[in-house]
Amino acid sequence: MLKDEVIKQISTPLTSPAFPRGPYKFHNREYFNIVYRTDMDALRKVVPEPLEIDEPLVRFEIMAMHDTSGLGCYTESGQAIPVSFNGVKGDYLHMMYLDNEPAIAVGRELSAYPKKLGYPKLFVDSDTLVGTLDYGKLRVATATMGYKHKALDANEAKDQICRPNYMLKIIPNYDGSPRICELINAKITDVTVHEAWTGPTRLQLFDHAMAPLNDLPVKEIVSSSHILADIILPRAEVIYDYLK
């Protein structure tokens, strides 16, 4: 393969890349979001400067990607922390677990999503929306909500989805020294909300050394939502360089 052909490739292996080129369109992307109150000292230990914490809140989320161009069907779960950067409110993506290798690869390589392999599920059990997250063979989170008890305003649902996402991009040199260390922003703007609901909600987190969601313990459920929407994943941009 010629050099000018090599540099045109998006990823490796050269003849079978880990993921295709975007844009990545999500049809009927299903969100189960729970905002809960946690310990402020615990948040201070994990939120990187220059992000600022407004309140001791965390959003636990499970998302079912039923139909994603180029990436297929998969489920994702994790924690996001409401923060602000230069006065702009958004969510710092703390950790994410999903069951799809192309989605893990594209999230880490083309952007800065903190994705690891995990086994989340989102399903309806009788009258209950259920979200679970397993790491390996162990359960680390169980979330439940009454199924479609109360309609949520579509504009409110859209506002939840369209908040800026702040992420860390860290890539070392081959000797382990810092090569890239950046704060990244990606904000979804292309979204169509089909349904939005809320209801009575509970969330359990369990201790795990390699999936430490419970380091941000649940003290009080603040709000919850169940949303179906079409979105297009945005491109990320660098907003802060730690090495300059």
From Swiss-Prot:
Optimum pH is 5.95. Pfam families: ADC. It is an enzyme of class 4 (lyase). Induction: By linear fatty acids (up to butyrate). Its EC number is 4.1.1.4. The record marks 116 as: Important for activity. It catalyses: acetoacetate + H(+) = acetone + CO2. The keyword Lyase applies. The active site is at residue 115. Keywords: Decarboxylase, Lyase, Plasmid, Schiff base. One of its GO terms (molecular function) is acetoacetate decarboxylase activity. Changing residue 115 to C/Q: Complete loss of activity. It comes from the Bacteria. Changing residue 116 to R: Retains 20% of wild type activity. Homododecamer. Catalyzes the conversion of acetoacetate to acetone and carbon dioxide. Lys-116 may be involved in the precise positioning of the nucleophilic Lys-115. Belongs to the ADC family. This is Acetoacetate decarboxylase. The lineage of its organism: Bacteria, Bacillati, Bacillota, Clostridia, Eubacteriales.
